[in-house]
Amino acid sequence: MKLTINGETRDVSAATLAALLKELDYVGNWLATAHNGEVVPAKERSSCRLSEGDRIEILSPMKGG
């Protein structure tokens, strides 16, 4: 299915947000995720079902200076 991930359209096979993170090789509970503009806590990612056209944001912490 086609999803918009961090502003880029991608074709993926994952059915849940947790599966998507695994498919895209994101690991760790330190990630921040949003599904169609709503924050999804780490504990809810496995129950967050994805649908064609959904918008996903995946953010990871960066060192600043």
Where are these regions (language model features)?
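Ubiquitin-like/PB1-type beta-grasp interaction modules and other compact soluble beta-rich domains
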Residues: M1-G64
